[in-house]
Amino acid sequence: MKKLLSALVILVFATQISFAQDAPKTEFKFNGLYNVWGQMQNDFTMGKTQYRDAYYVQMLRLNFSFNYGDNIKAVTRFDLGQGWWGVDNETPTYAGASGMFDNKDTHYSLHVDHAYIWFNVPSISTAFNVGRFNWAAGNKMVLDNNYDGINAIIKVGEVDNIKIGAAKISEGVLSISDLPKVPPDSKGGYDARDANLFTAAYNTKFGTSNLELYGMYYYDGSIEDSTAYLIDGLYYNRPRFTPQVTSLGIFGAAGTTKMDKLTLTYEANYLIGKDEIDNPSYAGRLNTSPSKIDPLKYDINNGDISGYNIYLKLNYAVAEAVTLGMVAGMGSGDDDPTSGKGNVNKLRTAGFFYITEVWEDSIMPDEEGITPQGLGAPNVRAYRELENTTALQLNSTLSITPAWKLFGSFTYLKATQPVFAWTAAGPDLTTSATDLGWEVDLKTDYKIYSNLTFTFRAGYFSPGTASKYLINGSDKWELAPWELKTVITFAF
């Protein structure tokens, strides 16, 4: 008996040693980013109201990866000590994290952006992401946001892959119920059914080109209460006369091509969907303050919505230290906010599609928590990305030294469809314009160390009649918006 017990102990001990030797290697990896930027924003309402915003914002972002061998890992990303200087850290005081930004009191002590697992199954050449992570397409014109869901990346050949995914965009009225009627939330919504997104993409590489073909379908089942997650579930204001999106299909192609000294970046997409909520007026609850009414919130349409975006960026290396560039883009607009089809240019984005400093640069107050910038911010309510915008930009980048770069640009902006003057009663279809204006921008980066950069940015926007109508409803006010920005970035 003793010999048997001894043999069992030796066997168990040997097995444990064998398992310990065969166990996958566990690794902990991290990197991060610290940003502090000073903003000086002036005359964004063109003189209708006094507008002088000068403030500092900081963010410490950390990325962590817990790897268990080569085929499984847990990943998270969070932000620490984030907010406006001069505001102590405290818990949110508004309904929904994003609602804090327009009131300038965002001050998270900790905010989690990503939390997911990644695992690879070599036998089927497929990797999976499960949890909360970034969902994006192309150049981030139509989709760029963090959502909860699952996607699969299927390897095809040596370099190609197919991605398919499903994301939960909204758990209706912040309730786990899926009933069409529950007690209402702060915005009056009571339909607890959900909004979901389904995506697919094919990524390929050939020669010096990378190409992405993508498609997605979004469906919101929570519209019985005459509200839709897009746009009623957002905690920031969209431009006036925006349709509610109850379903949306998006199809597009995006890529890059390098030919000797010339680099091309391009994208084209088409959007088609429905606004099944029959609004009798433009009025709705103000997104940033649900107890108040936004008299010009909604587009009135026939239930159909559609749109498109076309984008081309060229950079040509004239010399080792000099690059000349051009950016051209066109996005669809609504030719009549009182009837007919509505216009849509995206699902949801965080504003990282960049053309200009003032007109379009509008990093939004989405859940990642980044201060709004540019005229596309929710307190000004101009366009973002290429919404009803036709843009042509000429630019140049000069490498003064290996550590110092200078960028300058001139951009002409025109509305794709006329922008109508408006009053609180609605749009004036007899008064419209297409001249949005022009902008001159400057940006310089200086590397103090290889991973520590100081940046200065400046933009001056000369408004046309159409941008005055868009923001103020009238061309009575004419001050030119301008902005100065300083940034210190430490990447580690």
Locate the predicted segments by residue.
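The substrate-binding groove and active-site-proximal loops of carbohydrate-active enzymes
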Residues: 101-105, 132-140, 185-190, 240-241, ...
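Outer-membrane beta-barrel translocator/channel fold
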Residues: 165-233, 237-242, 247, 271-300, ...
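Hard-cation-handling environments
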Residues: 325-334
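Flexible glycine-rich, low-complexity coil/linker segments exposed to the extracellular/periplasmic environment
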Residues: 339-386
